[in-house]
């Protein structure tokens, strides 16, 4: 399963590293115009002059699989200048045709000025009930974050969440993996149509259930890196000077990457023997971010993810170093590696070791 730059969700149609498979050949056609000069007095005696005008035919890839920032497919602005998911995909097609066409290099010079349209069948949000600011503020709402143990979700639009999260039993399984959302006698789980919110790389959804005879309302926060926009049969139309008018179709998948911006973490001061303060695992255990059995330390991945705002990564302790000006402060450094199937926003999936925070000891 990303500080964060994403604001309130309005009409959401959620629609990098590149892995694309196709076998469509490069196609270039030539149009000839011929003029004959018959005895025009210039001594050329009836030579023919041919002017070649090249027209490139776009050859779409059958599968387009991309990874990148949420902003590539969703505009967080709410004003009249907000761009739709279709418009954002068009911008990417023009900027990076090699990701969409087998002859992308040949298209670079002509597609930038071409007319390109995209039809993914995107629909307006049906989450039109109570606004998030209303339902989430109620005193009895339970809050929790989608577990790293839960699967990524393929959606065609945000409305798919009401089906891809599954039936009552499936949603119960998701909630049972989240300590704050686990109910003793939970039944009748469902996703409501109340308003969504997108903030700090988390998409907030209202889930209701019954705990015995008691109605329960929950704020389920799903990291956006758990969402893949998957459109089978994405339609792309292209026309313009130097490019053959074409109506094309591809299977499109966009894996939303992990934003590696880290929240400022300032845990409360704890007591730990000075000799143990340079042991990062012992420090994490003392702070409540790890457990220990014998000599084996296990980091609480979900708890660290929530604390750091960095989701769908495996964290490992690297080091704990004393501050040069304060003997009671230590900088704890972690390594974060995207889980299988996840990537950073830049499309890479290698470990990042600059994840750190300051621990204070008393």
Swiss-Prot record:
GO cellular component terms attached to this protein's record: plasma membrane
Primary location: membrane
Lipidated residue numbers (S-diacylglycerol cysteine): 31
Keyword set includes tRNA processing: no
Family matches, as InterPro entries: Lipoprotein_p35 (IPR011653)
PTM info: The N-terminus is blocked.
Membrane topology: Lipid-anchor
Pfam families, per the entry: MpPF1
Residues carrying lipid (N-palmitoyl cysteine): 31
Localization annotation: Cell membrane
Region entry Disordered, spans: 33-53
The keyword Transcription appears for this protein: no
Signal peptide span: 1-30
Alphabetical UniProt keywords: Cell membrane, Lipoprotein, Membrane, Palmitate, Signal
Extra remark beyond the main annotation: The dominant B-epitopes are found at the N- and C-terminal regions.
Similarity section: Belongs to the p35 lipoprotein family.
Biological role: Major M.penetrans antigen.
Identification of the protein by name: Lipoprotein p35
Organism expressing this protein natively: Malacoplasma penetrans
């Amino acid at each position: 399963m990303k500080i964060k730059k994403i604001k309130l969700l309005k009409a959401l149609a959620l629609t990098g590293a590149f892995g694309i498979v196709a076998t469509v050949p490069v196609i270039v056609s030539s149009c000839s115009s011929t003029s004959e000069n018959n005895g025009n007095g210039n001594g050329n005696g009836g030579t023919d002059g041919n002017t070649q005008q090249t027209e490139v035919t776009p050859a779409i890839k059958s599968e387009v699989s991309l990874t990148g920032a949420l902003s590539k497919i969703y505009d967080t602005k709410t004003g009249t200048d907000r761009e739709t998911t279709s418009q954002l995909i068009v911008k990417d097609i023009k900027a990076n045709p090699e990701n969409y066409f087998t002859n992308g290099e040949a298209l670079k010079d002509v597609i930038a000025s071409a007319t390109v349209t995209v039809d993914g069948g995107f629909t307006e949000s049906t989450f039109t009930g109570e606004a998030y600011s209303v339902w989430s503020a109620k005193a009895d709402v339970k809050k929790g974050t989608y577990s790293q143990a839960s699967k990524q979700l393929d959606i065609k639009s945000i409305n798919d969440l009401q089906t891809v999260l599954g039936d009552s039993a499936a949603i119960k399984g998701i909630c049972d993996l989240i300590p704050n959302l686990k109910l003793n006698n939970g039944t009748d789980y469902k996703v409501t149509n109340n308003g969504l919110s997108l903030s700090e790389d988390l998409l907030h959804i209202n889930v209701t259930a019954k705990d015995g005879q008691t109605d329960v309302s929950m704020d389920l926060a799903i990291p956006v890196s758990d969402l893949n926009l998957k459109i089978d049969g994405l339609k792309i139309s292209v026309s313009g000077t130097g490019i053959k008018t074409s109506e094309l179709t591809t299977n499109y998948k966009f894996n939303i990457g992990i934003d590696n911006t880290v929240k400022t973490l300032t845990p409360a001061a704890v007591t730990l023997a000075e000799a143990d303060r340079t042991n990062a695992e012992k420090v994490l255990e003392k702070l409540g971010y790890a457990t220990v059995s014998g000599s084996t330390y296990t980091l609480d991945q979900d708890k660290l993810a929530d604390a750091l705002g960095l989701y769908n990564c495996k964290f490992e302790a690297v080091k704990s170093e004393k501050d040069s000006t304060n003997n009671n402060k230590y900088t704890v450094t972690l390594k974060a590696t995207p889980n299988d199937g996840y990537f950073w926003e830049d499309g890479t999936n290698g470990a990042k070791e600059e994840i750190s925070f300051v621990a204070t000891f008393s």
